[in-house]
Amino acid sequence: ISGTDRVFEAASSLSLNEDQLIINLQGDEPFMPVDLINTLVDDYTNNECDVITASHAIESNQDIVNPNCVKVLSESSYATDFMRIPSNEPLELLSRHIGIYGYSFETLKKLVALEPSEREINLKLEQLRFLDNKYSIYVSQYRKIIQSGIDTSDDVDAAVLYLNDQC
């Protein structure tokens, strides 16, 4: 079961309009800045897309080779691919994906009805299901520093240091 499936389960228990915007904040991204969420809402309102997500600049070569740091390839602010390790993609067109999504309740219902795509299964990236079924994904560029998500024990250690610095 994907994060999108869990969001649908929760959203279905609410009385939402079909065009109601739902923000899906991934649990492994606990340090999501409020201004990024607000930017997503604004960009969703001002751009034609089925799904909205976010990314920011890749900070190091370590990010490029880290499979837990998902990269997004985009053209004119629309995602064309997501990957864990780039192969032949121009590095200047890649950015680090941030685990947040937005979509209407109507689109969410359609997304969860889709079968997982082969690429989604192989790479364990649910957003590939959206792309592989021709759903447009607008990528908001976030220019501020954002604490990395938590995928490994090293990430937990980094999160603890980050939280200690914030106190």
Please provide the spans of the model-predicted regions.
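Short, surface-exposed amphipathic charged segments that create phosphate/polyanion-binding patches used
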Residues: 11-12, 67-70, 154
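Short beta-strands and strand-loop turn motifs
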Residues: 22-25, 52-55, 111, 138-142
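Short phosphate-binding loop-to-helix
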Residues: 1-25, 29-42
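Conserved core of the sugar-phosphate nucleotidyltransferase
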Residues: 32-117
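A short acidic, often aromatic-flanked loop/helix-cap motif at beta-alpha or helix-coil junctions
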Residues: 1-5, 59-60, 145-148
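Short, high-confidence coil segments that cap the C-terminus of an alpha-helix
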Residues: 18-19, 47-50, 135
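Conserved alpha/beta core of the MobA/IspD/sugar-nucleotide pyrophosphorylase nucleotidyltransferase superfamily
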Residues: 94-167
